[in-house]
Amino acid sequence: MSNALRWLLWLIVAVVVIAGGYALYTLLRPVGPEPAAPIAGAPAGISDKLARGEYLARAADCVACHTAPGGKPFAGGFAFKLPFGTIYGTNITADPQTGIGGWSDDQFVRAVREGVGPQGNLYPAMPYTSYTALSRDDVLAIKAYLFSLPPIKQANPENGLSFPFNQRWGMKFWNLAFFNEKRFEPNLNQDEQWNRGAYLATALGHCSECHTPRNLGFGINQSKNLSGEVIQGWFAANITPDKQTGIGAWSEQQLSEYLATGHAPGRSSASGPMAEAVENSLQYLTPEDNQALVKYLRNIEPIATDSASEVNLQPKGATSSSAILPGGQEDSLGRRLFAGDCSGCHQWNGTGRQSKYASLVGSTAVNDPQGRSVVQAILKGTRISIGEQHELMPDFGAQYSDEEVAAVANYVVGQFGEKQGKVTAKQVAEQRKQ
């Protein structure tokens, strides 16, 4: 027997064994019991199924991934730019041709909780790895709400993935390696409020999808849960209760206000994807659910990360400046650019003019020596709408060169974080693509 034939036979045997193992796993895998009330579901005061579905769809932030910028809600087209290509959020309106109008209850539940739709496996850009913990009743309430909305006929864009990532069947093996299909189970050592917060954070809110580092296989690294990750060029901060590098030094009021409005006095203002999460989802939580989420985040395992990013609440550059007169750093390109385009809103002492959202002192973004979110804000701008209040920072991506973006980002990190900025023109060029 030739070596080539021998290798071919071994390959066939390996494929058969792996396929058989996966088939056996799908039959025998433990999925856990259905979550029981009152942990699961919308607040008890919302009894109408459509109202429950609307609340849950907002808590799950469905609109963010299934709506293109400037597009119709839930009609799809949002682009996820990943290292291996681009994936587009799909149309989840009730249109029977281009949406999910022809899906049965079981098909919808399976897609949301197992990542398998009528046309095959979904990619984990759809956070079924978190939604798997949802109760069936909650998933079907979301479906009922989506089906109550006007159907929108809009074809889904073709994904732009390179081989082998464009082979959906390969997701079966990814799931085998990285997907733990299990319903939410309350922690009996914690009270009802904490467990409610856990359900909101881990299942509905899928916080770990953005705030937890990924491994080489793009699976979530649970050993570093919520300790921070880069998402679409923005740095999703450490939200564990570590006092130096997480949110452990925040007061409960600061955290509650940040979740409800996107701004915490003396701390951060939400930008980028986090601003979208607050705008589309978190601001609509009931006060009780807001407090449950706060309690959960304040009472999980703290994880210390890079101490170089520890927030400085009294940076010398800001404290030595007034609102209109700069102190601190010497003249530089970054300082001149800040003077011309930034100081009018942010002010030299970083307190912000007219809007609290323009404050910079205490921000996790300006305390990151790599300046990732600062660069994104300069390149892309950022916006947030809370109720009738609309806040906007314009983008400067077309106006500034890569060198200029790096210069002003490093100035901001130095002036308002008292850190040595490490942003380079090469980094900026890479972030422009994201």
Q: Model-derived features: where do they sit?
A:
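Short extracytoplasmic
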Residues: 42-74, 79
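Aromatic- and charge-enriched surface segment that lines or borders ligand/interaction sites
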Residues: 100-115, 119, 248-251, 255
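Extended, polar beta-sheet/loop recognition surfaces of beta-rich domains
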Residues: 259, 361-404
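C-terminal structural cap/anchor segments
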Residues: 330-371, 376
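Short cysteine clusters
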Residues: 62-65, 207-210, 342-345
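Flexible coil segments in periplasmic/lumen-exposed cytochrome c-class electron-transfer proteins
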Residues: 29-40, 67-86, 118-198, 202-203, ...
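N-terminal type II signal-anchor transmembrane helix
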Residues: 2-36
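Acidic/histidine-rich, surface-exposed loop or edge segments in extracytoplasmic proteins
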Residues: 86-94, 234-240
